[in-house]
């Protein structure tokens, strides 16, 4: 039926594309416009991640990550099935190497159980070998339904749905700011302003900058961290059947160097995690003066750095030495001792940080009038993307009493 409402989404990563699609589903016949500064969708975080569909093991029960990850898995699997996109439940083990890590593993198991993750179980050494014959460890947690996809392909399929529903996708169009008006919001580009009833900003690595330019909250700020990946040489691909992860260090918000099967059959080692001197440079030295100076001027970063110096020293060793990097993986799969690997394109993660140097763990979604800003959506952001879209659109419907079609499913 005809619908005279208009909506805009800023950013064509997987979350932006999912929000745009959700708007076309809930408001059929409305005008939905996606603004993306790059020439193609999925140009940044979406197109540079590991492709893992997380089951929801690690997240604080009751938080947005926990709730939206589980719903997101269901929606993503359905979407891939309906669009004939590859989706493989290869499973994952999280391996403890010592007694301290084994105690942490018990905590992860408790969280996974509380979050309703299906099929998770604890393994002894014999159990590890049943799942991954070449892996070693003191104990492990097995998540059989952890999966892999190609998130860039998923994003393109979402964008195709938006255009098929009559939406407009304006690639190569950078949004400078978004302002609230008496009856809606205006998206400002170099070509001028365009009015909409509702705007959702999903700008990832640029989320803090666009929020501040739009007079939204100053916090959280974004500090970019890069993750380096290596592609294991083909002769060793079969040494690992699925995904092998270390037990994460609770003092550091990243999951550590792990072995990840890709949907194309390649086996990845990585990523590590270290401060990035740019937000969007993926090769070479990766230094952007503006981005680097912004981090240096961020008082929260220095507080974070002071608290995490030992971990940073360990991580920089894996950054500068491929051998050191691969040795981390060999702790879990000793048969990789003679394996070589080639450097792949790095990924850059938008990590939200508070003024006191705390890394923001959960998703952060801020509402300002008729504008919604996604301020933090790290892993499992891609896994949760379709559920995040549902959550945001439903919140807008309730907040602004918008007339919509009922939610799917």
Identify the residue ranges that each predicted region occupies.
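C-terminal catalytic lobe of FAD-dependent flavoproteins
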Residues: 304-407
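Short beta-strand to alpha-helix junction loop
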Residues: 60-71, 95-104, 141-160, 170, ...
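Dinucleotide-binding Rossmann-like beta1-alpha1 core, especially the glycine-rich loop
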Residues: 51-127, 137, 256-257, 266-268, ...
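Flavin-dependent oxidoreductases
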Residues: 18, 178-288
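Beta1/beta-strand and adjacent pyrophosphate-binding region of the FAD-binding site
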Residues: 2-15, 33
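Glycine-rich FAD pyrophosphate-binding loop
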Residues: 24-47
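Flavin-binding catalytic cores
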Residues: 114, 120, 217-219, 236-237, ...
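Helical element adjacent to the flavin cofactor pocket in flavoenzyme catalytic cores
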Residues: 141-198, 384-397
